[in-house]
Regions:
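Short regulatory helix/loop adjacent to the ATP-binding pocket of P-loop NTPases
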Residues: 3-15
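Short pre-active-site segment immediately N-terminal to the catalytic Zn-binding motif
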Residues: 102-113
Length: 330
């Protein structure tokens, strides 16, 4: 784990010529690992290990083994002899978020805030391109410490991210705090982890990825050891470091304002989904997208009049261009 501390003489040519990097498995690796761990377990016909492998991006072999074991235990508890797809998906959530904390009772006000917070995340993601689809939203507290969470499942495994995709990711992370501000005019401690992750991503964009308009193509920090904590060290002047902090703050605030603007423009949809989530406590991505698609259809139908109406309203002169109707994503 610490090759940088080995004696240089030990690493001279002819001694350790081959280095084997044991990294996190990719999609194919996760699928093969799942096959190994499920070979002695009876699986139902609906099990799709490819989908489980796709959903578990970033998981290592031990995580997948734990997932399969939890799925088998769940099947036994429910009196079934075979593990089905829902067992595996539920166990995946158990591994990443912990079990439900049935003893935690939120007040009605807290439940409303958490509901709007989680729908804020999901809605900011769903209203934009370059975002991962929402697969589940819940406001049930879990042992991980979360009072609720919004799960997004990637459609495919990606190894490169564009600046636009990362900005949407930042906006989605800050969508929870934005919803709190838009609806209640307050800021709560529920966004602490969101802000921490957003700040870390924004810092990487500015100091490692060269995505700052002001600082440009400069690597301002280096990763000490990617196989341990992955901590970074700034390798620039103090004044440049201060400028980087300003850029990080500006990037975060711009994304936060964009998230607030989106939620303000779609306030009725935000209210509708938040109330539905408040009633059911947990909804699927399909249920969520039913509301979003219905809203998009209303906007599209309202912005595109029938052809006869368009012809009647068209000016006599063909030289005057007609302004395009706004799309739902705008």
């Amino acid at each position: 784990n610490r090759p940088e501390i080995l004696d240089k003489a030990l690493l001279r040519a002819g001694r350790f010529d081959r280095r084997i990097i044991v990294d996190r498995p990719n999609l194919a690796g996760r699928y093969q690992t799942l096959r190994v761990h499920t070979k002695n377990i009876k699986l139902a016909e609906d099990v799709d290990l490819h989908k489980i492998a796709q959903a578990t991006a970033g998981a290592v072999g031990a995580d997948l083994a734990n997932l399969v074991n939890e799925a088998a235990l769940r099947a036994v508890r429910l009196g079934r002899k075979a593990v089905n797809q829902q067992d595996l998906l539920t166990s995946f959530e158990l591994v990443i978020a912990g079990t439900e904390k049935k003893g935690t009772v939120l007040t009605d006000t807290e439940k409303r805030i958490v509901s709007y917070h989680e729908v804020g995340h999901a809605l900011v993601a769903a209203l934009q391109k370059h975002s991962q689809p929402v697969s589940k939203i819940t406001i049930v507290p879990h042992t991980s410490g979360a009072l609720g969470y919004t799960m997004q499942m990637p459609e495919e495994e990606k190894f490169l991210s564009s600046k636009e995709e990362l900005i949407v990711e930042l906006q989605t992370m800050l969508g929870g705090r934005a919803a709190e501000q838009v609806v209640f005019g307050i800021a709560t401690t529920g966004a602490s982890n969101d802000i921490e992750r957003a700040t870390e991503l924004a810092r990487k964009m500015v100091t490692q990825y060269g995505m700052s308009d002001k600082l440009g193509l400069m690597a301002l920090s280096t990763v000490s050891n990617p196989y341990l904590d992955g901590s970074t060290m700034m390798n620039c002047a103090d004044s440049t470091s201060s400028a980087a902090d300003e850029e990080i703050h500006k990037l975060l605030m711009d994304c936060y304002e964009d998230a607030k603007r989106l939620l303000t423009e779609h306030r009725a949809l935000l209210d509708e989904i938040a109330m539905y989530l408040l009633t059911k406590e947990t909804i699927t991505g399909d249920e969520f997208m039913t509301y979003v698609n219905a809203e998009n259809k209303k906007l599209t139908d309202g912005s595109e009049p029938a052809q006869d109406e368009q012809d009647a309203e068209a000016p006599a002169s063909p030289d005057v261009p007609q302004e395009d109707a706004p799309s739902a994503s705008d």
